[in-house]
């Protein structure tokens, strides 16, 4: 089916009209293709493609609109070659450890957005004091920072939703291939950030061989989404931990034209990806060049 019957390319990444504009095409979708066999070859893992990460969102990633356009085209062009799609959704409430509401100084001020909370910070937790202070100490020991982010991806808000044109494409994929798109929520624990989809920032959780097997039977795990510097990078780092198990030998293909770093993190992120690609089967590629 022509792409313009599935999405409105001019509105990608912008506040958008009701889904009803495209429901008239659903019956056409249903009869366009027959069910396609799942060969367990290609898994598309889309990280946090949500409205709040678009350029007009509350935590904007400059370049996210083009990322979504490229990703939509990639799915459309490879409809018969993608065996499974999983989508993660950053899912928060207003009172979490990485938001202003959690911290206050002696004068009653909250930290600014993008502030870094250290163990010796003048800002003190208003909730779960002991656990919060331990969390910051553990992060600092791991050379990680607790960043105060703008409020984003609050459950029930427009910002939490998948970018609508991508959601149209996911619906199209599901209807014509008869394959369910799996949606995974992450990040609801108020006491920890959760960038990667498998484990929180500070956690005693060990990734298991059972979980490894759920991903390892795919030849290729294709990764896209936002933001490259945080949730995409950490998800790939956690995926790389699966290589310790005999049942995981997948290629991890990163679509670099379908993911963008938060501004200011680009150089550090590129260095980390180069390190991962030199050590593991992490392949940095492009949605227009990749052959499945």
Regions found by a protein language model. Name each.
Residues 1-45, 49-87, 92-292:
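Active-site-adjacent betaalpha module
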């Amino acid at each position: 089916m022509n792409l313009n019957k599935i999405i409105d390319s001019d509105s990608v990444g912008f506040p958008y009209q009701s889904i009803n504009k495209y429901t008239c095409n659903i019956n056409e979708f249903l009869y366009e293709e027959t069910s396609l066999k799942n060969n367990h070859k290609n898994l598309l893992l889309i990280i946090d493609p949500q409205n709040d990460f678009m350029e007009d969102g509350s935590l904007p990633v400059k370049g996210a609109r083009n990322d979504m356009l490229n990703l939509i085209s990639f799915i459309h062009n490879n409809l018969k070659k993608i065996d499974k799609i999983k989508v993660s959704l950053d899912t928060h409430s207003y009172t979490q450890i990485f938001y202003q509401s959690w911290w206050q100084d002696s004068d009653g001020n909250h930290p600014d957005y993008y502030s870094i909370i250290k163990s010796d910070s003048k800002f003190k937790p208003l909730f779960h004091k002991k656990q919060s202070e331990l969390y910051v100490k553990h992060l600092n020991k791991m050379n990680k920072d607790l960043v105060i982010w703008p409020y984003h991806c609050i459950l029930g808000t427009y910002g939490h939703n998948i970018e609508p044109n991508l959601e149209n494409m996911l619906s199209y994929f599901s209807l014509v291939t008869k394959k369910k798109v799996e949606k995974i929520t992450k990040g609801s624990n108020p006491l920890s950030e959760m960038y990667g989809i498998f484990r929180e920032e500070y956690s005693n959780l060990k990734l298991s061989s059972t979980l490894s097997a759920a991903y390892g039977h795919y030849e290729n795990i294709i990764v896209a989404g936002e933001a490259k510097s945080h949730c995409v990078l950490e998800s790939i780092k956690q995926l790389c931990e699966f290589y310790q198990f005999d049942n995981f030998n997948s290629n991890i293909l990163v679509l670099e034209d379908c993911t963008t770093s938060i501004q200011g993190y680009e150089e550090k992120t590129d260095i980390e990806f180069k390190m991962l690609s030199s050590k593991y089967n992490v392949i940095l590629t492009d949605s227009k060049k990749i052959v499945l």
